[in-house]
UniProtKB/Swiss-Prot annotation:
Subunit record text: Interacts with ADRB2; the interaction hydroxylates ADRB2 facilitating its ubiquitination by the VHL-E3 ligase complex. Interacts with PKM; the interaction hydroxylates PKM in hypoxia. Interacts with WDR83; the interaction leads to almost complete elimination of HIF-mediated reporter activity. Interacts with BCL2 (via its BH4 domain); the interaction disrupts the BAX-BCL4 complex inhibiting the anti-apoptotic activity of BCL2. Interacts with LIMD1, WTIP and AJUBA.
Source organism superkingdom: Eukaryota
Catalytic reaction(s) noted: L-prolyl-[protein] + 2-oxoglutarate + O2 = trans-4-hydroxy-L-prolyl-[protein] + succinate + CO2; L-prolyl-[hypoxia-inducible factor alpha subunit] + 2-oxoglutarate + O2 = trans-4-hydroxy-L-prolyl-[hypoxia-inducible factor alpha subunit] + succinate + CO2
Name of the coding gene: Egln3
Swiss-Prot/TrEMBL domain comment: The Beta(2)beta(3) 'finger-like' loop domain is important for substrate (HIFs' CODD/NODD) selectivity.
Binding site for Fe cation: H135, D137, H196
Induction of synthesis: Induced by hypoxia. Up-regulated in proliferating myoblasts induced to form differentiated myotubes.
EC supergroup of this enzyme: oxidoreductase
Binding site for 2-oxoglutarate: R205
Source organism (scientific name): Mus musculus
GO CC aspect terms: cytoplasm; nucleus
Required for interaction with ADRB2 as annotated region, ranges: 88-104
Protein's recorded name: Prolyl hydroxylase EGLN3
Length: 239
């Protein structure tokens, strides 16, 4: 049986028998050893190159403080990658696999109809106790419905290095602590069901995040943004 066919069957099985049930039951799930060490290493090396070459910039806050850099609230440095850039072949392969997993989830994601996603956000917490305070990725209906994070940290020891992603599932009596270990892929709902935080990191911590958009909510969010832009421009023109 061709390797591609085996991979397709494996991804479809993972999507339908693991990701979909977990998202509906607890709101999140993760897969370990997703790419394997060889391909995972290629992704890690490219991310390190981006970091060392100065491509990363301070992450910005969303919501009322949009566009503001507050290092005590959000301490990561980021850049955005489409996957087609030179030297990003391994990243592109990773993104294609995540795309296929989400595609196989299909109509089983409840009300959501996924047609597009963001670019990949490559993030580095440089240590020194940097983290990201409790927040919701999509608190106000911007279209994001699924958050996917791929971790790249070898020999990570949360007791020494911190950097745990703590999820506070809405309506649940527990919190979920996800250690950012190498080759782990995490999925969770992007809306208010999953407030989360990145606890202080005391070693360099790499991750790559993509967000998948619900088509209807995304279109409505873009419409609201266009209307707001027109109103703002009109108000400025009157001044």
């Amino acid at each position: 049986m061709p390797l591609g066919h085996i991979m397709r069957l494996d991804l479809e099985k993972i999507a339908l028998e693991y990701i979909v049930p977990c998202l509906h039951e607890v709101g999140f799930c993760y897969l370990d050893n997703f790419l394997g060490e060889v391909v995972g290493d290629c992704v890690l090396e490219r991310v390190k190159q981006l970091h060392y070459n100065g491509a990363l910039r301070d992450g910005q806050l969303a919501g009322p403080r949009a566009g503001v850099s507050k290092r005590h609230l959000r301490g990561d440095q980021i850049t955005w990658i489409g996957g087609n850039e030179e030297g990003c072949e391994a990243i592109n392969f990773l993104l294609s696999l995540i795309d296929r997993l989400v595609l196989y989830c299909g109509s089983r994601l409840g009300k959501y109809y996924v047609k597009e996603r963001s670019k990949a956000m490559v993030a580095c917490y440089p240590g020194n106790g940097t983290g990201y305070v409790r927040h919701v990725d999509n608190p106000n209906g911007d279209g994001r419905c699924i958050t996917c994070i791929y971790y790249l940290n070898k020999n990570w020891d949360a007791k020494l290095h911190g950097g745990v992603l703590r999820i506070f599932p809405e309506g649940k009596s527990f919190v979920a602590d996800v250690e950012p270990i190498f080759d782990r892929l995490l999925f969770f709902w992007s809306d208010r069901r999953n407030p989360h935080e990145v606890q202080p990191s005391y070693a360099t911590r790499y991750a790559m995040t993509v967000w998948y958009f619900d088509a209807e909510e995304r279109a409505e969010a873009k419409k609201k943004f266009r209307n707001l832009t027109r109103k703002t421009e009109s108000a400025l023109a009157k001044d």
